[in-house]
Regions:
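Auxiliary, metal-adjacent structural segments of Zn-dependent hydrolase domains
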Residues: 84-144, 202-210
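N-terminal low-structure segments adjacent to metalloprotease catalytic domains
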Residues: 1-90, 94-95, 100-101
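Charge-rich, solvent-exposed alpha-helical interaction surfaces
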Residues: 65-68, 72, 76, 99, ...
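Active-site recognition of the HExxH zinc-binding catalytic motif
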Residues: 163-179
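Long, well-structured alpha-helical subdomains associated
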Residues: 205-255
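Short pre-active-site segment immediately N-terminal to the catalytic Zn-binding motif
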Residues: 150-165
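Post-HExxH zinc-binding segment in Zn-dependent metallohydrolases
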Residues: 1-30, 183-227
Length: 255
């Protein structure tokens, strides 16, 4: 498996406007204000809240909304894209991309070998594109049906990016191994966290313990109860020579 790292400006722009995202730096709010003033309708779409633009029930007003959107979507997009603030986001993201690329290249052999050992089979021979976003705008997603990962996060601890790139890779692997619905449920996600967030992290850093690093909780809090239930079985699985992640999933699926 090969990872290539890119900065996609369009993806970066819309990700940076997401309504759940903080501002990467204080000046970014100036661009948001300008976009809102130019068209609150288009801005609502861009920030991921399109439903707020269609609260009207009058069909003629809805048509007017659609007409306004078609006229103003490009001007608002260009306003943001050409702003000095967005250019700063692009510049800082490119610097971060180099950091992530260097870290992955340093760690990829042990990371991929560890995944193959824990999965119990070789990983698919495919190329995955990693779209890098600003590290202060948290991102970690595997796009279903595509060999694409979105990634951006501050380094909360050593080799953070490597661990969570492996985490996103495993989402794809689990879907391939277990099917769409099973590969995305709480048990499979908990297995991914035990495998990458915990076991891989400890192996990469040659130290650490499960569920905590630098006094920070590791992984999703809502998965912790599942993870602790299957942890004894996981520890036994780690000692097995003939590992198969599909068999392990079946074993713990009713715990």
């Amino acid at each position: 498996m090969k990872l290539i790292f890119k900065v996609n400006k369009q993806y970066l722009l819309f990700h940076s406007l997401g309504f759940r995202q903080p501002n990467p730096f204080p000046e970014w709010v100036n661009v948001k204000d300008k976009a809102w003033k130019k068209s609150s309708l288009v801005y609502s779409f861009f920030m991921g809240r399109p439903e707020s633009a269609f609260l009207e029930t009058d069909e003629n007003k809805v048509k007017n909304i659609i007409n306004e959107f078609s006229k103003k979507v490009i001007p608002v997009f260009d306003l943001i894209k050409n702003s000095k603030e967005f250019k700063r986001i692009v510049s800082e993201t490119k610097e971060y991309k180099q950091f992530v690329t260097n870290q992955w290249n340093t760690n990829k052999n042990i990371a991929l070998e560890t995944l193959e050992e824990l999965v119990g089979s070789t990983l698919p021979k495919k190329t995955v594109t990693v779209l890098i976003t600003h590290p202060k705008l948290h991102n970690g997603v595997h796009f279903l049906g595509k060999n694409i990962i979105g990634w951006g996060h501050e380094e909360d601890w050593k080799n953070y990016s490597t661990v969570y790139l492996a985490h996103e890779i495993m989402h794809s692997i689990m879907i391939e191994k277990l099917g769409l619905s099973t590969g995305r449920n709480g048990i499979s996600h908990s297995i991914i966290e035990l495998m990458t967030d915990n076991e891989l992290r400890i192996r990469l850093n040659n130290s650490g313990k499960y569920f905590k690093e630098n006094n920070k909780e590791i992984g999703h809090p809502d998965l912790r109860s599942i993870e602790k239930k299957i942890l004894p079985a996981w520890k036994k699985y780690l000692k097995k020579k003939d590992k198969k992640i599909e068999k392990f999933y079946k074993k713990v699926s009713n715990i």
